[in-house]
């Protein structure tokens, strides 16, 4: 409060706002009912939750001091009229550009809650604040709003823990790939595949148009709602790239980006300055995986040594050369300036064949589909197709085009819903489920993800990045 001549005071409007906000704030378990555990990874744990009804108590305004209530009160005829309807909720209508947090969610809405893990030194948990990855993810999700990006509902800070509440998606590309490879044992219908890739490119084009690199595109991070809308998730490695914050550019912040099977050759060769082309290479890898139901460049990742120096990923480079043939300076003039170019030459020889064409045509007879894949797998990042140009490619006009709201339109396939387990042994804060229903963890980025069932007892799993 500010003092004025005569001894009076002026009520600070922000003080009133903060007092009201603090009175109305509810904890995560008082706001959402945890339905089950979805997955766990390096940075967090993800739960499926449903919104609880608001408590039947006196209004927050009546809980404030009388002077504050008077300052906040308005005559009934002056109250603002509602500007939202149920149909305008972007969680119900993905075409809307309004932010999900612009209106209160309704009871029964389902969400995915990501809880960040605290740092760990030995066996002791430490709370040193939010990680760079977490801060970046929150910032970008709050700023970016698009039909093909996962929507952030709210961020909750409680008991030194941070929770991100996202819209819920029943499927992801990895689940769809697993269903076709293990259950249906049949390829993804060409029309469905084109729509999946088209919506993915729409989201990627939006990110690149706003100078954002995703840097971790892979099937497990590409979600699909039950309405058939593709949603790009996990912006933990994403960052702005038009004005690098460090003198070392993008390399200075994160030296290792993109999961190894989807990593572009310029990253493998140690590029310190790179562009949105790294995301397009990953999209090409995803396209090939949707087509063949298995990763096209499945190399073994070399781990860092005790000196924390980054090793050259020879095996991954070899897998790429097995499909595309060895790269030559005529194909990529800038390769001779790559930090790892001499290492690449010294660790050969690499296969000299180029079986991409027969590999593709054994799975599809579309010449346009092959053309766009070749342009995504261009060695030279400066020549690699952009998301904008890819969306204009004639392949997307085949068989009636992709001008549909749902990627599942015209398909008779019913994909299983996302697996959710009862698990609470790793997180006492979220442990609202009965102990008798406790189980293991669910794989979120493994080809061994089972394809059906809602509540299951899973087998042991490998850690995934969440």
From Swiss-Prot:
The keyword Zinc does not apply. Residues 58-105, 421-466 are annotated as: Disordered. Keywords: Activator, ATP-binding, Kinase, Magnesium, Metal-binding, Nucleotide-binding, Nucleus, Repressor, Serine/threonine-protein kinase, Transcription, Transcription regulation, Transferase. Gene3D superfamilies: Phosphorylase Kinase, domain 1, Transferase(Phosphotransferase) domain 1. InterPro entries: CDK, Kinase-like_dom_sf, Prot_kinase_dom, Ser/Thr_kinase_AS. The active site is at residue 216. Its cofactor is Mg(2+). It catalyses: L-seryl-[protein] + ATP = O-phospho-L-seryl-[protein] + ADP + H(+); L-threonyl-[protein] + ATP = O-phospho-L-threonyl-[protein] + ADP + H(+); [DNA-directed RNA polymerase] + ATP = phospho-[DNA-directed RNA polymerase] + ADP + H(+). Component of the SRB8-11 complex. The SRB8-11 complex is a regulatory module of the Mediator complex which is itself involved in regulation of basal and activated RNA polymerase II-dependent transcription. The SRB8-11 complex may be involved in the transcriptional repression of a subset of genes regulated by Mediator. It may inhibit the association of the Mediator complex with RNA polymerase II to form the holoenzyme complex. The SRB8-11 complex phosphorylates the C-terminal domain (CTD) of the largest subunit of RNA polymerase II. This is Serine/threonine-protein kinase SSN3. The lineage of its organism: Eukaryota, Fungi, Dikarya, Basidiomycota, Agaricomycotina. The gene is SSN3.
């Amino acid at each position: 409060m500010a003092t004025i001549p005569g001894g009076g005071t002026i009520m600070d409007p922000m003080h009133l706002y903060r007092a009201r906000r603090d009175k109305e704030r509810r904890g995560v378990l008082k706001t959402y009912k945890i339905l089950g555990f979805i997955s766990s990874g390096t940075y967090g744990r993800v739960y499926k939750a449903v919104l609880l009804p608001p408590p039947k108590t006196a209004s927050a305004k009546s809980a404030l001091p009388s002077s504050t209530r008077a300052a906040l009160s308005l005559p009934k005829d002056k109250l603002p009229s509602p500007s939202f309807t149920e149909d305008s909720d972007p969680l119900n209508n993905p075409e809307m550009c309004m932010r999900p947090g612009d209106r209160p969610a309704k009871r029964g809405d389902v969400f995915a809650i990501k809880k960040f893990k605290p740092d760990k030194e030995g066996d002791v948990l430490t709370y040193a604040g939010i990680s760079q990855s977490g801060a970046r993810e929150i910032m970008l999700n709050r700023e970016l709003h698009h039909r093909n990006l996962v929507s952030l509902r709210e961020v909750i800070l409680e008991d030194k823990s941070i929770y991100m509440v996202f819209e819920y998606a029943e499927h992801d590309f990895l689940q769809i790939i697993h269903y076709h490879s293990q259950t249906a044992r049949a390829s993804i219908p060409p029309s469905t595949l084109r729509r999946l890739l088209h919506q993915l490119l729409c989201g990627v084009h939006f990110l690149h148009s706003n100078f954002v690199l995703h840097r971790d595109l892979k099937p497990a991070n590409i979600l699909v709602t039950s309405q058939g809308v593709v949603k790009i998730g996990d912006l933990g490695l994403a960052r702005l790239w038009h004005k690098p914050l460090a003198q070392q550019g993008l390399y200075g912040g994160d030296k290792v980006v993109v999961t190894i099977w989807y990593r572009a050759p310029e990253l493998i060769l140690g590029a310190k300055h790179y562009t949105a082309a790294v995301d397009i290479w990953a999209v090409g890898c995803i396209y090939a995986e949707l087509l063949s139901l298995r990763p096209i460049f499945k190399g073994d990742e070399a781990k860092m040594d005790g000196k924390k120096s980054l090793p050259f990923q020879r095996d991954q480079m070899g897998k790429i050369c097995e499909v595309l043939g060895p790269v030559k300076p005529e194909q990529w003039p800038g390769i001779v300036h790559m930090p790892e170019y001499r290492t690449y030459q010294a660790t050969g020889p690499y296969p000299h064949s180029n079986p991409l064409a027969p590999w593709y045509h054994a799975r599809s007879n579309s010449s346009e589909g092959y053309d766009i894949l070749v342009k995504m797998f261009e060695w030279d990042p400066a020549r690699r197709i952009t998301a904008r140009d890819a969306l204009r490619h004639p392949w997307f006009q085949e068989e009636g085009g992709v001008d549909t709201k749902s990627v599942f339109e015209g398909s008779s396939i019913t994909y299983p819903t996302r697996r959710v387990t009862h698990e609470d042994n790793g997180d006492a804060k979220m442990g609202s489920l009965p102990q008798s229903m406790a189980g293991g963890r669910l794989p979120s980025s493994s080809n061994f993800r089972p394809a059906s069932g809602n509540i299951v007892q899973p087998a042991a799993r490998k850690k995934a990045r969440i």
